[in-house]
Regions:
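Conserved aromatic anchor
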Residues: 507-519
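Short beta-strand elements bearing conserved aromatic residues within extracellular beta-rich modules
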Residues: 170, 424-426, 522-524
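Aromatic, loop-rich ligand-recognition surfaces of beta-strand-rich domains
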Residues: 370-439, 449-497, 502-504, 514, ...
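Short S/T/G- and acidic-enriched coil/turn segments that sit immediately N-terminal to beta-strands
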Residues: 242, 422, 451-452, 541-546
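Beta-rich carbohydrate-recognition and catalytic domains
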Residues: 22-208, 220-267, 282-283, 289-335, ...
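Short beta-strand segments within Ig-like beta-sandwich modules, predominantly Fibronectin type-III
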Residues: 442-445, 536-542
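Predominantly extracellular/luminal regions of secreted and cell-surface proteins
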Residues: 168-182, 335-371
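Beta-strand-rich modules
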Residues: 547-569
């Protein structure tokens, strides 16, 4: 080979390697794998932790922009799957807080989210550059703002974050510096936790503390106005988004029968509130929301996204079914689909035997297979001699992996830190003796704290081994190492003994069933009609559920199924709760 041919071949290898390293996949998995920022507005606590919350996602000129609380910039994507961070020329010194964003006719992108609550609306026609300018006026007392400009070019602002005040709204004069037209705002949405069970505060809605309403967002669809809001609190598993529907931007609005429309209280990654809804590839809507982690600090959070639909009756719903398992990516979900595109790959690693090179006593390696986002393993040292090995117990077909890294007792990371990366090798074996490389990130420069990797082709494996090389900071701390694919055994049998008893307090229902041999867990589904079972709750390690999210006076219908690493059982339907 001559020198010129050798150089061309070498450059091609580098190019192919760089493409492979990006792992552009046909699926995605929550939590979203973003290079989350380390906020410093709580630096007095002395803890460094990543966080991302309150996403405002908009389409602009065929591409997408995501604005996230306290991120010192924002993200850009061409496909709603692969996101690159933008450090704008001008931005909030403290980072934006619960931001608003709106695309005005593909000519100007508007944003606002000053943490002080007093803010000018910012605008630019070049968000990739980020040369933001301010409308020469200041709007006061805005918490969690949401800007909406209707087709008739009338502009509206919605806002509110309180357990005392409602979501309010007012019309703004676009031709006069976006100043309010009326002196007093309209009070639009109040929480009614005495009627709407899901609006009650606390983990599983069990607290008597007054809940919070926040995170407004407006979506116009088929001439109807869908005013969305979050409740009851961002630090709980039941944080979700509800919706009221009206015929005009300022109402009156009617509470939707199906509520909350986006709700993810069970499983690995819980919480789905304070989000935004955007029309993505193929005309499919996507709702982005906030996952609660709340370990280093109560507002330690991550992001999620779910396909969202409007059915033939105009009912808005997000499909959170198997919502933290692999799903088809936005460009793979067809325009005609009425489901969320769950890929059908099951969790092979849940509760499986695991061993490691070392561990701290309070953070054992068993935590990497317990399917709990709040637990993690900590190695004794952060060096290249650390490893984790999972025994799947049976040879299975492995399709994808998710590796979740954690911030444990870190103190030196604030804002957008340079040179963040995780370097490692992932190997697979059928017999525990002969190993093949699945993922080689030993030379990676990518910051991927929730790295989801879809393999080019499924592989046979019983053992999965993580071999550590480098993470920044003092400690190697890992959450779950999740292995997805299909086992070769039997699916669970159909659930028996399924009972649903609605309590005297109609907001609550007690659900129970007989445990199914060989089942990992169960999906309990419910809805306001037999063909509208749009809500679901993943239950691991139990055969009962106290569901406290119902609406007084509303009929509900239920179903249940069991699942394991081999697949999903047939569903059992119960037409109505008694």
């Amino acid at each position: 080979m001559d020198k010129k041919s050798y150089c061309i071949a070498w450059l091609m290898l580098l190019f192919v390697g760089s493409l492979h390293a990006q792992y552009r996949t046909t699926t995605y998995c929550n939590p979203l794998n973003l290079d989350y920022t380390y906020p410093f507005h709580n630096s007095h606590l002395g803890k460094s932790y990543r966080s991302g919350a309150d996403p405002a996602v908009v389409e602009f000129r065929g591409e997408y922009y995501m604005f996230v609380t306290r991120s010192w910039g924002y993200w850009h994507s061409k496909d709603l799957l692969n996101w690159d961070f933008i450090t704008p020329e001008k931005w909030y010194f403290e980072g934006c807080n619960a931001p608003a964003a709106h695309n005005y006719k593909d000519s100007i992108l508007y944003v606002c989210g000053n943490p002080s609550g007093a803010m000018s609306i910012l605008y630019t026609d070049n968000p990739k550059r980020g040369d933001w300018k301010a409308v020469p006026s200041v709007l006061h007392d805005l918490q969690d703002p949401a800007l909406f400009i209707d087709d008739d070019e009338r502009a509206y602002m919605y806002w509110g974050s309180s357990n005392r005040w409602p979501i309010r709204g007012k019309e703004l004069d676009m031709k006069n510096k976006f100043l309010p037209i009326a002196k007093k705002p309209d009070s639009l949405l109040f929480l009614r936790p005495d009627i709407h069970g899901w609006e009650r505060f606390g983990e599983n809605h069990t607290s008597d503390i007054k809940p919070f309403i926040e995170g407004a967002w407006m979506t116009k669809h088929n001439g109807k106005y869908y005013l969305q809001y979050a409740a009851p609190g961002t630090q709980f598993n039941v944080y979700g988004d509800g919706v009221y529907v009206g015929k005009s931007p300022l109402g009156p609005f009617q509470y939707a029968a199906h509520n909350p429309f986006c709700y993810k209280p069970g499983g690995f990654a819980t919480g789905a509130g304070h989000g935004s809804t955007v029309c993505g590839p193929g005309g499919i809507y996507w709702h982005f929301g906030t996952i609660h982690l709340s370990i280093n600090y109560k507002f330690e959070r991550r992001l999620c996204m779910f396909p969202t639909f409007f059915d033939e009756d105009g009912v808005m719903y997000s499909d959170t079914y198997f919502g933290d398992y692999p799903h088809y990516s936005p460009d793979q979900v067809s325009r005609q689909t009425t489901s969320g595109g769950f890929r059908g790959w099951m969790l092979l690693s849940y509760g499986k035997p695991v061993k490691a090179s070392s561990q701290l006593e309070s953070y054992p390696v068993e935590n990497v297979t317990d399917e709990n986002l709040k637990t993690f393993w900590v190695a004794e040292k952060n060096d290249d001699k650390q490893w984790v090995e999972i025994d799947l117990e049976e040879v299975s077909d492995v399709y994808a992996l998710q590796l979740n890294f954690f911030d444990y007792e870190e103190t030196g990371f604030w804002g957008r830190m340079p040179n963040l990366r995780q370097r490692y090798l992932v190997e697979a074996s059928v017999d525990g003796a002969r190993w093949r490389v699945l993922v080689d990130y030993r030379n990676s420069f990518r910051d991927a704290p929730h790295n989801y990797i879809e393999l080019d082709q499924p592989i046979e494996a019983r053992y999965i081994r993580y071999r550590h090389h480098y993470v920044p900071g003092k400690n190697l701390a890992m959450g779950n190492i999740r292995v997805f694919g299909l086992g070769r055994g039997k699916k669970p049998a159909t659930v028996k003994g399924f009972t649903v008893v609605r309590e005297a307090d109609e907001r609550n229902v007690r659900i129970s069933w007989k445990a199914v041999k060989g089942a990992q867990g169960y999906n309990v589904l419910w809805g306001v009609a037999p063909d509208k079972l749009y809500s679901s709750w993943m239950v691991y390690g139990d055969n009962s559920l106290d569901l406290r999210a119902l609406t007084v006076g509303q009929k509900y219908y239920f179903a249940i199924e069991a699942f394991n690493e081999n697949g999903i059982s047939q569903r059992v339907f119960l037409r109505e709760a008694h």
